[in-house]
């Protein structure tokens, strides 16, 4: 009986797939779109524009793109080539040096944390999406049950403060007066805090589960599962919509935004360069951190997605396209955000800095409030939150697939491959259950705690160790030859230098910067207690600790009479390291093929008829020339 690939019937998988056991992307566009959806997430919309205006406007673009060239693209290319060469997920690739397999487990832990709270953000976007399907947005006025006496809506003729606005000057006086006396709160802020979250006073006060959010969380996980029900075979089709439609929405919102009064002021505030700020270390640190985190490096997702590529796919080209697309999207989103915020600031008669925000405050408070000022505001709100949902889902697909692929590759038997859909369902159910505490009244505190600690400096450490393991333990010369065997050309000299020296140096700089700039987390005026911060550090360490723990375990289990012998055996590549298919095991890997085939029958070519036809492999190099490799079969 044939193997079931990614939950699909065998006949569907054997038409074009090179690796019949794991399956491949339907075509290269699916991989590129999936990777774009993975890299382009919520942070591109709600974090980058804020960092840009805070760090010198247009001047911030200079360090940002410098970090992209010297750190972002090289690391992206390294992870793609790593996964594609071995055709394995974030665990299986560490056959390259088994002692470092803990790095893969660390990536799984990080992806688990991110997947839990990221889907809660998506579920909140679902909630706002459904709430926008009204004639009047529910956060427009102050006449709702959840509003307080301090609420003062910019459109409220009968607000709780009982002011009657007759002109823009009166509106300005109202705003200034409220700031001095009542500390004005907007309807959107009260809707967010008092209706959606019903936020408690302390992180330890969980209160009740918010059933509407719980329902939206279930919807979110159901959508993710259905899109991954056949692995990359189904998600590869979904991304044609989820990865492209956000750009349609961004363009619609941009065109609408620039036609509004005050939009130019917002855009100028966003772009006007303050060149003196590029001399500040914090600006360079923010640029490096944003590049590193926004590309999804060290999460395990890039390795996983690339593992489903065909062996000779040009991942060098893909890494450049995807990285530049990610950064260009961030810049483009800034125009969309600040054109609307500029209009809002003009309407209120205040400076743009008074309405600018980042994170959940931008997505669920500031921007929704600005949308209430537009005609047909429910339409714009529906589009905005639908865009957030799609951006979040694109990342969530890869986070879940990273975990599922790691489990399936690690077990590796026919049964687990046949029932991969059940593994996906199991991981989705566990993710849903672990996300329930984040739908309580203290959920936002825990969400921000996980966001700040679970995937912060631990990612930097994981990425740094990965560079050291591949470049210095396995050996840069061997890795460069591996890439040449796979692509038909060695990595360009620039990337060789970056991988060995520049990128690890920048990663180390990010780590030092993160430590120096560390401040205890707070949410608005709420300061997190020490015990909560301790839990945050434990979450961060839980991924990093996998590396030394597994190294100790591997040394203990390795053969050898002395510690040095065990260490040497734990460090050197395992016998089954290399291309997954024997037809690709040429050069120095051909010498291991006979031994590997005898000891592992599954390593035999899965498509011998194809191999008989393809006696030579022609690979298109970056210079446009054809490189021919004779088949060793």
UniProtKB/Swiss-Prot annotation:
It catalyses: glycine(out) + chloride(out) + 2 Na(+)(out) = glycine(in) + chloride(in) + 2 Na(+)(in). Pfam families: SNF. One of its GO terms (cellular component) is plasma membrane. The chain crosses the membrane at residues 31-51, 58-78, 113-133, 209-229, 238-258, 283-303, 330-350, 373-393, 429-449, 453-473, 493-513, 533-553. One of its GO terms (biological process) is neurotransmitter transport. One of its GO terms (molecular function) is glycine:sodium symporter activity. First expressed in early tailbud stage embryos in the midbrain and anterior spinal cord, and weakly in the hindbrain. By late tailbud stages, expression extends posteriorly in the spinal cord to appear in between somites. Expressed in the forebrain, retina, between the somites and in the blood islands by the swimming tadpole stages. Residues 588-633 are annotated as: Disordered. It is a multi-pass membrane protein. Glycans are attached at residues 158, 164, 173, 179. It is found in: Cell membrane. Residues 1-30, 554-633 are cytoplasmic. Residues 591-602, 617-633 have a biased composition (Polar residues). Residues 134-208 are extracellular. InterPro entries: Na/ntran_symport, Na/ntran_symport_glycine_GLY1, SNS_sf. SUPFAM superfamilies: SNF-like. Keywords: Amino-acid transport, Cell membrane, Glycoprotein, Membrane, Neurotransmitter transport, Symport, Transmembrane, Transmembrane helix, Transport. Sodium- and chloride-dependent glycine transporter which is essential for regulating glycine concentrations at inhibitory glycinergic synapses. Belongs to the sodium:neurotransmitter symporter (SNF) (TC 2.A.22) family. SLC6A9 subfamily. This is Sodium- and chloride-dependent glycine transporter 1.
């Amino acid at each position: 009986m044939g193997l079931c690939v990614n939950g699909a019937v065998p006949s569907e998988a054997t038409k074009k797939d090179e690796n019949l056991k794991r399956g491949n992307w339907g075509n290269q566009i699916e991989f590129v779109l999936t990777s774009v959806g993975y890299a382009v997430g919520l942070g591109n919309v709600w974090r980058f524009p804020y960092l840009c205006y805070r760090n010198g406007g247009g001047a911030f673009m200079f360090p940002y793109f410098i970090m992209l060239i010297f750190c972002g693209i090289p690391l992206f290319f390294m992870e793609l080539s790593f996964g594609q060469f071995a055709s394995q997920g974030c665990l299986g690739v560490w056959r390259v040096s088994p002692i470092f397999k803990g790095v893969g487990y660390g990536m799984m832990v990080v992806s688990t944390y991110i997947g839990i709270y990221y889907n809660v953000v998506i579920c909140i976007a679902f909630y706002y999406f459904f709430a926008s399907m009204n004639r009047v947005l529910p956060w427009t006025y102050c006449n709702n049950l959840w509003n307080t006496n301090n609420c003062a809506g910019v459109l409220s003729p009968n607000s709780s403060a009982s002011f009657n606005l007759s002109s823009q000057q009166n509106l300005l006086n109202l705003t200034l007066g409220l700031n001095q006396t009542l500390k004005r709160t907007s309807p959107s802020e009260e809707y967010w805090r008092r209706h959606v979250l019903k936020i408690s006073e302390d992180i330890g006060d969980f209160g009740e589960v918010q059933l509407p959010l719980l329902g939206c969380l279930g919807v979110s996980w159901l959508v993710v599962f259905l899109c991954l029900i056949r692995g990359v075979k189904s998600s590869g089709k979904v991304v044609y919509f989820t990865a492209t439609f956000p750009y349609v929405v961004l363009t619609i919102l941009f065109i609408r935004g620039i036609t509004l009064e005050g939009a130019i002021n917002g855009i100028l505030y966003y772009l006007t360069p303050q060149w003196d700020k590029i001399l500040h270390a914090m600006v360079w640190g923010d640029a490096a951190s944003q590049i590193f985190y926004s590309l999804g490096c060290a999460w395990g997702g890039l390795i996983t997605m690339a593992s489903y590529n065909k062996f000779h796919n040009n991942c060098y080209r893909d890494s450049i396209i995807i990285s530049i697309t990610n950064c260009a999207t961030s810049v483009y989103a800034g125009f969309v955000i600040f054109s609307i915020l500029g209009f809002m600031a003009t309407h209120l008669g205040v400076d743009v800095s008074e309405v600018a925000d980042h994170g959940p405050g931008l997505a669920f408070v500031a921007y929704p409030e600005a949308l209430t000022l537009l005609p047909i505001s429910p339409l714009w709100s529906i589009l905005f939150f639908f865009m957030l949902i799609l951006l979040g889902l694109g990342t969530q697909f890869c986070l879940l697939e990273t975990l599922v692929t790691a489990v399936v590759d690690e077990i590796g038997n026919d049964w687990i491959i046949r029932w991969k859909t059940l593994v996906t369902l199991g991981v989705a159910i566990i993710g849903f259950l672990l996300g329930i505490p984040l739908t309580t009244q203290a959920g936002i505190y825990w969400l921000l705690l996980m966001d700040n600690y679970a995937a912060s400096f631990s990612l930097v450490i994981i990425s740094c160790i990965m560079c050291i393991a591949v470049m210095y333990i396995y050996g840069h010369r061997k890795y460069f030859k591996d890439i040449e065997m796979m692509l038909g050309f060695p990595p360009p000299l620039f990337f060789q230098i970056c991988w060995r020296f520049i990128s690890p140096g920048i990663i180390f700089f990010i780590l030092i910067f993160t430590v120096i700039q560390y401040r205890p987390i707070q949410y608005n005026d709420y300061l997190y207690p020490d015990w909560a911060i301790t839990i945050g550090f434990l979450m961060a360490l839980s991924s990093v600790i996998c590396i030394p723990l597994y190294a100790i375990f591997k040394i203990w289990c390795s053969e050898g009479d002395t510690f040095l012998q065990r260490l040497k055996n734990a460090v050197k590549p395992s016998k089954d390291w290399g291309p997954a298919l024997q037809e690709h095991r040429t050069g120095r890997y051909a010498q291991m093929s006979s031994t590997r085939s005898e000891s592992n029958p599954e390593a035999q070519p899965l498509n011998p008829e194809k191999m008989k036809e393809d006696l030579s492999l022609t690979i298109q190099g970056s210079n446009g020339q054809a490189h021919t490799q004779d088949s060793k079969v």
